[in-house]
Amino acid sequence: MTHVLVRRQGQGKKRRWDVNMTMCFFLFFFVFYVSFQIVLSSSASVGYSRLHLVASPPPPPPRKALRYSTAPFRGPLSRDDIYGDDKRVVHTGPNPLHN
């Protein structure tokens, strides 16, 4: 007795269609999940908190307020006292060719 397997015409196509739909569903779910994670991570980043949650820094003071008062400095009255006897000596390092 010989057994002959008879395949119906529409059964193979339906199974293939079910597999394709399942794969499309999981692919869509995966893309949706990844994009949702990207949105969540970008909203929790420093840029979002700086723009939305943290108060902005105070504005800079006006231009005239930036000047600082300094104590007056006066050097010696004669220019010869600045260097003293050492004014004509050329200081060189270990190699006199490289000043």
Swiss-Prot record:
Belongs to the CLV3/ESR signal peptide family. The modification Hydroxyproline is found at residue 94. Residues 1-21 form the signal peptide. Residues 77-89 have a biased composition (Basic and acidic residues). The lineage of its organism: Eukaryota, Viridiplantae, Streptophyta, Embryophyta, Tracheophyta. GO terms for biological process: cell-cell signaling involved in cell fate commitment; maintenance of root meristem identity; phloem development; regulation of cell differentiation. InterPro entries: CLE_plant (IPR033249). Keywords: Developmental protein, Differentiation, Glycoprotein, Hydroxylation, Secreted, Signal. Glycans are attached at residue 94. Residues 77-99 are annotated as: Disordered. This is CLAVATA3/ESR (CLE)-related protein 17. The keyword Metal-binding does not apply. One of its GO terms (cellular component) is apoplast.
